[in-house]
Amino acid sequence: MLTLDKFEEASEKVKEVTLETKLIYSDFLSDQTGNKVYLKPENMQFTGAYKVRGAYYKISTLTDEERAKGLITASAGNHAQGVAYAAKCYGCKAVIVMPTTTPLIKVNRTKSYGAEVVLYGDVYDEACAKAYELAEKEGYTFIHPFDDLAVATGQGTIAMEIFKELPLVEYILVPIGGGGLATGGSTLAKLLNPKIKVIGVEPAGANCMQESFKNGKVTTLPSVNTIADGTAVKTPGSNIFPYIKKNLDDIITVEDDELIVAFLDMVENHKMIVENSGLLTVAALKHLGVKDKRVVSILSGGNMDVITMSSVVQQGLIFRDRIFTVSVLLPDKPGELAKVSQTLADVQGNVIKLEHNQFVTTNRSAAVELRITLECFGTEHKEQIIAALEKKGYKPRIVRTMI
């Protein structure tokens, strides 16, 4: 059972290995949403995510015999690092089963804490089944990433810190994968203030908790499809579901495109790297439907590999109309490219890529296609560039940007 005294005990325990991350007031997000928005930056933890809270507290509740057997878990990344680091602190062996799709940074960081990593399956649920199999075969003690009350208690210590710093908080947004943080966070928040609103946020492509809420029971999704790999879970926790059903006020889902834009917002306005799952609570702010409220968004982690980061930045710039590609047809004769270039230069269009296709028509003397990828200042500047091309007699056509 989740009780206030257990949360208080866990809060003291996790101080041994965690930072008490301080709330950051966001002028940008406050202006965007009409609320007073604060960020709880758990991406600043030593392990890059909040998960070490639940892992460390759970291991502290085990017997010496259970720890001596060695620990095993399954994780898409952040719980893996939490268990690996906590096990290292306790001097325990740790085996971590991770999906084959786990970002390289999370795999390498997990190994760096001394854990043995087994890559198996495409999603968390498949990795979890493998971990249970190995636990039974080798006698390891299994540490569930979310469907465990001790783990949820450790995760819930975040709410204790939020109330300590912002006692009059009115809304807390929590990301949901399997539901551990939502369980601990919402339960403790309601114990501290029954009137507070706690909102869960899931990826639209992995909304297992939302479906479970609708059906009134734990529901398994047939598949998941989201860039938020840390919350790509098919089945939420059955042991913790009753707590979530009781204490969570609502669930919001967000699209991958919204996460991409949120990533750019955090980089440009807060100079912070937050992984896609951690951005759920930022992207959800515009769907909250309230004004003039004190809102805390929990940034659950910041473990993102550089390749993914690069892709997200590029896509974000495209969504923001900061990068776009335009196609024009022009005669295949000397000087035509120079004319187009001058037209773009006159309106400060910065060319970053050119593709010249002579085979777009059967008569290349009549027309060749020029595809120009440009960097600009935003939608208004993009429209100015298009207008300048039209004024010169071209018929510009916006096409998909491929970088």
Regions found by a protein language model. Give the residues of each.
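PLP-dependent amino-acid enzyme catalytic core
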Residues: 1-403
